[in-house]
Amino acid sequence: MNNNNVTEATSRAQIRPYYDPDSFNAGYSAVFKPDEGVVDPHGYTIASKLNVINSSPTTKRMANALFKSSPMKKLSNSVNDGLSLEGSNGEITGLNNFEWAELVNIQKWRKIFEQLLDMFFRKYFQLLIQQPFDVARLLIQVGEFKIFKTTVDTNKPQAPIILRDEEGDGAAREGEEDAYDEEEIDFFPIERKIAEANSTAPIMAEETDHSHHEPTDISLTIAPQSLHTIDVINALFDQEGIRGLWKANNTTFIYNFLSLSIDTWFTGLLSSFLGVPDPYFMEVINSPDISKSFILALGAGVFTSIILLPVDLIRTRLIVTSFKKKKNVKTDGKNMVTNTRSLRQLIRCWSWRKNGVSIPLDMWSLTILQSINNSFFNKLFDLVIYNQFHIEKYSQTVMYNTMKFFSKSLELFIKLPLENLLRRCQLNYLLNDQRLSFKVDSTELIVKPKKYNGIWDVIRNNSNTNRGQLWNGWKVGVISLICGYGLQMMNKVDINMEQEKF
């Protein structure tokens, strides 16, 4: 080591014989010396001027112990020479206090808390706007409604106009008007006819559908005038009130939060075993092994959806049941929760050991397929458009957002039938599984449930139902896509319009 230093100094002296590191001054405010570090014109190092070094004698002893055995002995001596002997200035009293001051930084934690609070309010407010439409879509997917259209027969001849003697019929007309005033006026004839038509629905359901043992309660069911989302929302508002529009709002928020958290935890855990970067910190397109990263994203999504399956069941239960019945009944000596609105109480009733084996294969399959569909389009989209079309979201924002819109439209077209079948399967499971502690009684439903006999029954159309009903709720999805696409286009940054300032 010493020989190398001597050789380096000799070669440096041969190149610049006039240069002396100890006395050479180029006019800089600080000079770097290999043996001492950065030194100011007065001969003191930068390390000797730190507040943590000048704080107390305790810190001086720690610094001496740190640099005493170091090969940079001259640097240690310069630090000791520059230490102040006047004691502490009252700000930091030692090295331990310095570390705690960095950890308990009020400004830093305040900024983090403000960011979390801002994100919380943004997500929750977004859910408040979206939830009424999602509730209406789920009711359309699982409910069967009798919609009667009122038509006017144009071929029927109109009644002829009869001329009468006003003076002779005056007394009779006054009597008719008095009788007419006493009659009760029906201001809503259409709604009355729909309610009367739906009143016969339990009798028909009892004869045709043997899977549901009890008919629905007519006083709780909603009767929309059509299957349009707005009509369903109006009917729900008339039946359940304002809070009926935000059914399971907090449960949905908790489900979304847990879904993101668990999926992030799974990807972070499994990425270390697969030897690939976490997809949440590095996009799949930038991964050194794209296939492993893509499989990791799909697997984490599937595991997350399976773990949160009980919460998804509870969310469906809260939406399809009414607020008006709240009681606990005993069935076979066991307390069965019939219509509690508490997520904490309902999740306590779930047991994977008891209820996991009773989950039908259809529900497992539909849950996994729905998760794969979401992960496939979200994770594989950037990879496909970059490799096939050479489109990148930072340099080609308009084209990227347009391609993303078409990709989301295709995802919605595939997602709706899977979601429709999954909701029917969940409601059928909630109605008929006897081992389920929070089993739903059919008299608590606000809709008449559609018949569900399995996926193959729907595919083969054995029930002679309209297969177009599998895409119920597509209007809400399309409106959401269009609004999201419009926001992305308005928030885009036009690179050509920006000027770089120096």
Curated annotation (Swiss-Prot):
Keyword Cell inner membrane: no
Residue positions where N-acetylmethionine is found in the record: M1
Topology, Mitochondrial intermembrane side: 315-502
GO BP, sorted A to Z: mitochondrial fusion; mitochondrial inner membrane fusion; mitochondrial outer membrane fusion
Solcar repeats, residue ranges: 288-383
Stretch list, region Binds FZO1: 1-294
Tree of life domain: Eukaryota
This protein's UniProt keywords: Acetylation, Membrane, Mitochondrion, Mitochondrion outer membrane, Repeat, Signal-anchor, Transmembrane, Transmembrane helix
Family matches, as InterPro entries: Mt_carrier_dom_sf (IPR023395)
Intracellular or extracellular location(s): Mitochondrion outer membrane
Cytoplasmic side stretches: 1-293
GO cellular component terms attached to this protein's record: mitochondrial outer membrane; mitochondrion
Spans traversing the lipid bilayer: 294-314
Bilayer disposition of the protein: Single-pass type II membrane protein
Free-text function comment from the UniProt entry: Required for mitochondrial fusion as well as normal mitochondrial morphology by bridging the essential interaction between FZO1 and MGM1. May coordinate fusion of inner and outer membranes during mitochondrial fusion.
Record note on quaternary structure: Interacts with FZO1 through its cytoplasmic domain and with MGM1 through its mitochondrial intermembrane space domain.
Name under which the protein is recorded: Mitochondrial fusion and transport protein UGO1
Organism: Saccharomyces cerevisiae (strain ATCC 204508 / S288c)
Gene: UGO1
